[in-house]
Amino acid sequence: MKRILTLTVAALALGTPALAYDGTNCKAPGNCWEPKPDYPAKVEGSKYDPQHDPAELSKQGESLAVMDARNEWRVWNMKKTGKFEYDVKKIDGYDETKAPPAE
């Protein structure tokens, strides 16, 4: 009996903090983020604005385009030979400035 009472008290003690938060500041269930008091409503132009360089941002887009071009060559080679070749430099006729030949 003493053991059950101890376990019940422990469960209540551990579960009580979960009941303390009433969610009054949540915009929706689970959306409870609030900015700090000095955080601006508009980030652009404030001290929190990261001011990313457009050239740096375009690098990822360029690398994705080059990756897609290599994948086109891999797919073309797979259809042609039936064998997948990861290293595009080993594909006959590979030219990084051109698209693979039309079928």
UniProtKB/Swiss-Prot annotation:
It comes from the Bacteria. It comes from Paracoccus denitrificans. One of its GO terms (cellular component) is periplasmic space. Coiled coil: none annotated. Heterotetramer composed of 2 alpha and 2 beta subunits. InterPro entries: Meth_DH_bsu (IPR003420), Meth_DH_bsu_sf (IPR036557). The lineage of its organism: Bacteria, Pseudomonadati, Pseudomonadota, Alphaproteobacteria, Rhodobacterales. Catalyzes the oxidation of primary alcohols including methanol. It catalyses: 2 Fe(III)-[cytochrome cL] + a primary alcohol = 2 Fe(II)-[cytochrome cL] + an aldehyde + 2 H(+). The keyword Signal applies. Pfam families: MDH. This is Methanol dehydrogenase [cytochrome c] subunit 2. It is found in: Periplasm. GO terms for molecular function: alcohol dehydrogenase (cytochrome c(L)) activity; alcohol dehydrogenase (NAD+) activity. Transmembrane segments: none annotated. SUPFAM superfamilies: Methanol dehydrogenase subunit. Keywords: Disulfide bond, Methanol utilization, Oxidoreductase, Periplasm, Signal. GO terms for biological process: methanol oxidation. It is an enzyme of class 1 (oxidoreductase). Disulfide bonds join C26-C32. Belongs to the methanol dehydrogenase subunit 2 family. Residues 1-20 form the signal peptide.
